[in-house]
Amino acid sequence: MVNMKASMFLTFAGLVLLFVVCYASESEEKEFPKEMLSSIFAVDDDFKQEERDCAGYMRECKEKLCCSGYVCSSRWKWCVLPAPWRR
């Protein structure tokens, strides 16, 4: 009977330890994506200036020219991807 109590206590202590380790690693992992996303989407000043000078995808191109890689749709007056089937 003593062995059963000791094994139950050790099992319970092991589960508590496993929970604590998992919780600690999960809290560290939550910070990692935030740091990674902020570094990915960090924009330098040159890119911001280029962004203001041209219109991006599905933006009006009446007054602004489309950014590189896009063409102005003659029908809708939006910047779209160039494709052979477009008029």
UniProtKB/Swiss-Prot annotation:
Keywords: Disulfide bond, Ion channel impairing toxin, Knottin, Secreted, Signal, Toxin. It comes from the Eukaryota. Expressed by the venom gland. One of its GO terms (molecular function) is toxin activity. Disulfide bonds join C54-C67, C61-C72, C66-C79. InterPro entries: Huwentoxin-1, Huwentoxin_CS1. This is U3-theraphotoxin-Hhn1a 2. It comes from Cyriopagopus hainanus.
